[in-house]
């Protein structure tokens, strides 16, 4: 029985190391423009059901962040953004952070936010938001880069993603 647990632990560590080894760090853009949101804009326009890894978003909070309590993955913070799109258009997008994996990330109204993580399609219950970005933390599955969120120049997670 002990050897079974050791085998499972070793396999888990190898899988985590492989995921971390394949994940890459993506730099934060120097300015928030429609070009930063181009991939997200295409996903929104195509009504993509998602999820889609490695998507960037930037914008300004339209109100303060709010907490989403509990659940199987702990507390989350919801950051409501207005993002610039091509042609002077805008969209409302929600960035979701995980207190356990990212630290407690909050933002006041009017905060500049950049995030990189996994796109998800919103439900009618989440309107007026047309999309969301979550998994803005170190990669937890194969194919995902290390995610992050930046609020008014402060980057989260604040620890390195390297093992």
What are these regions (language model features)?
Residues 7-16:
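Bacterial N-terminal signal peptides
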Residues 1-4:
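Positively charged n-region of N-terminal signal peptides that target proteins for export
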């Amino acid at each position: 029985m002990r050897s079974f647990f050791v085998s499972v632990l070793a396999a888990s560590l190898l899988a985590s190391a492989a995921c971390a080894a394949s994940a890459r760090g993506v730099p934060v853009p120097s300015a928030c423009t429609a070009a930063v949101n181009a991939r997200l804009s295409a996903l929104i326009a195509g009504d993509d059901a998602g999820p889609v890894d490695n998507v960037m978003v930037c914008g300004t909070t339209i109100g303060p962040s709010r907490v989403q309590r509990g659940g199987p993955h702990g507390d989350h913070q919801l950051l409501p953004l207005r993002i610039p799109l091509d042609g002077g258009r805008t969209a409302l997008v929600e960035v979701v952070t995980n207190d356990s994996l990212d630290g407690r990330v909050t933002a006041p109204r009017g905060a500049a936010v950049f995030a990189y993580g996994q796109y998800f399609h919103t439900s009618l219950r989440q309107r007026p938001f047309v999309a969301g970005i979550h998994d803005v933390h170190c990669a937890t599955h194969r194919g995902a880069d290390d995610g992050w969120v930046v609020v008014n120049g402060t980057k989260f997670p604040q620890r390195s993603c390297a093992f």
